[in-house]
């Protein structure tokens, strides 16, 4: 599936709609911010999607994706850094996940260099799961 679209396999519990952060019906819950910065010596565009601050609790609950922060290389629009925050809590599922992905160029190839994950989820009738890991990717053999 792709974050920001409704191209997901299942739509149980309205999750399909909740992942479509650019859908016209979901836009009322989010701020969309474009800026730029220098990140690791690369000029980057910064695109942030985050839940609006002035929402009521019931409105915030409509937004499974609480934040997506992306740094795009200005030269080719490759993602150099991406951060996700997911929060959802209802009678069927409770989840809270943070994912951060670092990407860079190795031998001219765009590759992930580090992935951080810190998450919790509990689905009705299943054991709750908690994971926290830091995956460092290195020694790429680019041919």
Regions flagged by a language model, labelled:
Residues 67, 98-107:
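Extended lipid/amphipathic-ligand handling interfaces
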Residues 40-48, 78-83, 109-114:
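Short, hydrophobic/aromatic-rich segments at coil-to-beta transitions
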Residues 49, 81, 96-98, 112-118, ...:
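Extended beta-sheet lipid-handling architectures
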Residues 57-59, 94, 99:
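Flexible domain-boundary/linker segments
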Residues 65-68, 72-86:
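Long, charged/polar, surface-exposed segments that mediate recognition or autoinhibition
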Residues 89-94, 106-109, 114:
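Membrane-proximal, glycine/serine-rich, low-complexity loop/turn segments characteristic
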Residues 37, 72-73, 104:
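Hydrophobic alpha-helical segments, especially N-terminal targeting/anchoring helices
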Residues 1-64, 88-90, 120-143:
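Structured extracytoplasmic
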């Amino acid at each position: 599936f792709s974050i920001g679209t409704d191209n997901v396999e299942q739509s149980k519990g309205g999750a399909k709609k909740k992942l479509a952060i650019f859908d016209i019906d979901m836009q009322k819950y989010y701020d969309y911010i474009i800026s730029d910065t220098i990140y690791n010596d690369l000029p980057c565009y910064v695109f942030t999607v985050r839940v609006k601050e002035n929402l009521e609790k019931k409105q915030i609950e409509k937004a499974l994706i609480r934040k997506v922060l992306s740094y795009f290389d200005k030269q080719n629009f490759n993602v150099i850094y991406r951060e996700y925050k997911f929060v959802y809590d209802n009678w069927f599922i409770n989840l809270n996940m943070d994912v951060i992905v670092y990407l860079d160029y190795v031998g001219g190839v765009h590759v992930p260099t580090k992935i951080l994950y810190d998450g919790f989820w509990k689905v009705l009738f299943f054991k709750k799961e908690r994971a926290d890991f830091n995956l460092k990717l290195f020694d790429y053999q680019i041919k």
